[in-house]
Amino acid sequence: MKKESNSGISFFQRYLTVWVIICMLIGIMLGHFLPGMKEALNYLEYAGISIPLAVLIWIMIYPMMMKVDFKSIKNIGKNPKGLFVTWIVNWLIKPFTMYGIASFFFFVVFKTWITPDLATEYLAGAVLLGVAPCTAMVFVWSTLTKGNPAYTVVQVASNDIIILFAFVPIVKFLLGVSNVSVPFQTLFMSVFLFVVIPLAAGIITRLLVVRKKGTEYFEQTFLHKFDSATTVGLLLTLILIFMFQGEVVLDNPLHIILIAVPLIIQTFFIFFLAFGVCRIIRLPYDIAAPAGMIGASNFFELAVAVAVALFGTSSPAALATTVGVLTEVPVMLTLVKIANKLKEKFKYE
């Protein structure tokens, strides 16, 4: 049984939290003992965006976009209720509950330890996580909960399309409420660089390879060639970020835990909200499970990229998004176990 529960998740994915901690330590040590590296990297910027970081993020996101079959959009009418739950929770509820929960903890509960200025930047990072529903890892969570594969593909594809239109205005609105000045052009450029370009490249690559070698070759062989690229891209990105975050982490180690608290609470809340609504409207379990998972998990790669572009590599906002990476896997694996235990509740008479 244990083997089966882990069959859909790779060794790297299962221990992502461990790798994040290791990368934190490596990055902090490099930044402390080799400060010249940070100074050199500061010169490799264009329009405020770190070129090395942009390349690493493309390496991460490009393989994810290749996995999404946008032709599946034609099947959007087969599970409309499940998709409506996903869209409403992801875009009309989740960003605003993240804002509310994070604000409450950063400005009220943790005000003894977090200054108002830091709280504002941590909130900005949390908002970026809350507005970006998960893309690649949803396939893993869906597999572990025995979700409907066809529905999972459609929900991921549709949400990726919605990101193109909804991400910028929602982020702009919520950060504006927090009196965080975000240039619209910078925000739009971030989405163009880190969503539109890899998305277009992924679609084109998929079409060309499938046309030449077939779908089976693409999904069974070609995609797996990029598994290590995504892993390396994520690890190097984390090391790069923590090179600049070292002083912040060393001065405020408790803040890592404080940031994690509202992120974890939000994850559980959104999962049970979507999962519960699916139960109320009597959707089958294999639809309800992935519907809950996509809202609960975050597109943390995009959140990290936009945080760095908007606020800088050494910003508290960027730190908040990396804490999202730290908590993602253990929390989601817990939700997988909960979902599987509640499977019997979705058998209707």
Segments predicted by a language model, with ranges:
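Alpha-helical transmembrane segments of multi-pass small-molecule/ion transporters
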Residues: M1-M66, K71-A296, F300-E349
